[in-house]
Amino acid sequence: LRHLNSESSHDRAAQEERLAARRGAIWMLVAAFSFACMAASAKLIPEVPNTEKVFIRSLISVVLTLLMLHGAGSRAIPKRPWMLMWRAFFGFLGLWAYFEAIDRLPLGTAVTIYNMTPLFAAALGMLFLSERFRAIQILSLLVGLGGVALIKGLSPEVTWVGVGFALCTAFASAIAYTLVRVLTRTEHPLTIVMAFAVVSLPLSLLAGWGSWRMPEGMEWVWLFALGVTTQSGQVCLTKALQSLRASRATQIGFVGVIFAMLLGIPLGDGIPGMAQLAGAGLIFWSLHIGRQRVTKESSR
């Protein structure tokens, strides 16, 4: 009887784990679509300074998060304020660089290079967390960079400045996502989102001082859409990281590249060329071979 109870408890735990993983996957899919819509909204308003986009996005996020925090009570009180501030700083840096990349690159290309985030996260783990950086991870990083070079070298519409901003986005996001993964152990998801928005407000205001202009007409609509989709993406991403391993969440997030390429077609990017597709394929392959080692080690 004790043995049967033990098996029953084990089955229930396994079922709950599968359900949690399924919920996490759904959250990540919604996050990927939200971020693709955010990128499309940003691309539709090229005349609005990018620091202004970050400011208005953060202002909308503060209002929406305050409404969502109603009822969270003491759970929303920050436990690690300094770590929250660092996560917010790198999140701000990554978001600003992302908007700069979107202005200079086809939408699908910018999102593809951004998805090198986990490769940079692995390198950061070696440098700052004393994690082993194996040969397969070095290979995956080189293959990924090769994919970026292929996209740039054979695509005349892709500039090195745009590629640089996209790589900066991936690097800053790697730091921010690593901190989010740690913060979700003690912080309410909305607390993490609120900290990001609150810190981004003064940073974007200072960074864009003197270059601001009043949005006109439909620019207000796209700025509002940018704020709402970024908010939904941040909330869904934070919830996904509560249920999924970072590597699994990143793998599901690759769907965002497909969303971005499809959205980019009516925005004037056209159908992706062979160079872009081949470069994207190399980047995806690099992420796959880099993840294989992590999967093998986690199963031991």
Residue ranges of each PLM-predicted region?
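Glycine-/small-residue-enriched transmembrane alpha-helix faces in small-molecule transporters
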Residues: L1-E52, E157-V182, S299-R300
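Membrane-interface interhelical linkers
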Residues: L1-F33, V62-W86, A135, R185, ...
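C-terminal-most transmembrane helix of multi-pass membrane proteins
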Residues: R2-N5, F254, I258-R300
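Specific transmembrane alpha-helical segments of multi-pass solute transporters/efflux pumps
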Residues: C37, G73-T109, Y114, L150, ...
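Alpha-helical transmembrane segments of compact multi-pass small-molecule transporters, enriched
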Residues: I60-L64, I113-L127, L142-V143, V198-L203, ...
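C-terminal transmembrane-helix exit sites in multi-pass transporters
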Residues: L69-G73, E100, T117-L139, I258-L277
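Helix-helix packing/entry segments at the starts of transmembrane helices
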Residues: V111-M116, L183-V198, Q234-I265
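Hydrophobic transmembrane alpha-helices of multi-pass small-molecule transport proteins
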Residues: I136-K152, S173, A275-V294
